[in-house]
Amino acid sequence: MTDGAARLLSRHLAPPPAPHSLNIAPPTYSSREKEEEAARRVFKHAYGRLISRHPTVRWTSGQWMTERPGGSDVSQTETTATYAPSASTDDTGPWVVNGYKFFSSATDADMAILLARTPGSSGLSAFYAPVQLPSGERNGVRIVRLKEKLGTKPVPTAELELRGMRAWLIGKEGEGIREISTVLNITRVHNSVSAASSMRRALAVAKAYSRVRKIAGGRVLSTVPLHLRTLAQMELLTRASTHLAFLAVHLLSLAESPLKTPPTAVIVHQGSASRLLRFLTPLTKAVTAKMCLSVISESVEALGGIGYLENEEPLNLARLLRDAQVLAVWEGTTNVLITDLVSSLKRPSPSGGEDRSYFVLGEFIQENLGRGAGTLKGDSGDLLEKAKIAIWKVWESLTEEIECGSREELTAGGRRLLWRLAYVFVGTMLLVDARRDGDKGAVEAVRRWVLRREISLGERGRREEGGIEGDAILVFGDENVRHGKFKL
């Protein structure tokens, strides 16, 4: 939320002032222009606080949108903002906000980005508000009650009554949804990275436990084929989430700083990053959250009763599971994200008909599937070539489905659409990774995700070559298997 707020405010900072000639009188400003200049000054101060790493300087930001009538549907927002310039000279803002926020994320933050309805405007507007006034008093904010949550308890969530809260308008009246989407995109990317990192942490605990836990006959748990197969499936989903999450990070970097992002193994054409990000953000957030819950739950089970206990913090999978549940809830549940994704895929064109901007997805897939083809020889090269063909066939089928299906039909079957898209994009990224250096674990991941379609925990499809040794390579790495650090 803090990163998202910083990015949003950075888009409204004043440009550097042009130098004035000594012979030219300084320009005069209207009251509205003076107010806009004051807003930019306030935003610049807040932005500096948000990006600071100094503990006594830095700020955190909350995000207050959810209200009782609407939940995820912010169009039902009842909070109002009235233009009422203060006679004082402080920087508290010329707007007065009144309303009730049912969920306030980061209640202990120093500032907040919120939505409110202004008189005479059909849309919502976005506002910046400090939580405290310069006098030290709270800025019209009353905490009604703290929420009792399943997890993420160190991050307070509360119901708030806003009465006379002073605020600054961000952008134009009625364009709050467009403004707040900047924050939503970044928080959804953060959500995806949190999912991938939580999976990796849980899996690391499960792997470490499997290498020291001895069962009947003194056999180490990691050498039991069934347990090893389970770890391999968890590893596959963790890799899938990591690739998706950091593809979104890369696209976000390109969208914000196209000239400062170093080249990578992934082909993204200049100007297409923002469009790709628009489609992939809801997809990535939804899929990584689901896979995260599956892997962490399985990690708890992999430790048996020990996993269900409240352990020391580094090993506390019980808390990790509680905290991870929010990843599929906040910033859009799975169905909300699917609706958002389908809306992007079937968006009407301003000139009539449908906007086929989703063709950028096909261009990305085609170019990255073709990049580096033929660099690996032998069995691995043949496997990757089969995978490339399989991915492209599914994408062609998806394109036809998107082209011919109505918005209602695609939304109703949205979960299937979501996972088929995930199959294509994860498969493409796994293929790019495997071609990069021919790592056996990466090639094995392609075999399982693309050719065996193991996109969820549990056996899927027919048994293929790779078997137990493939499990070991995927989980513990080829080096460990070859040098005897892992023995079946």
Question: Language-model segments: which ranges?
Answer:
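A glycine-rich, basic-preceded beta-loop-alpha segment at the flavin cofactor/substrate interface
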Residues: S135, V144, P156-T187, A204-T223, ...
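Extended, well-ordered alpha-helical segments in internal regulatory regions
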Residues: A240-L247, C292-V295, T333-T334, D340, ...
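A short core secondary-structure module
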Residues: T92-R138
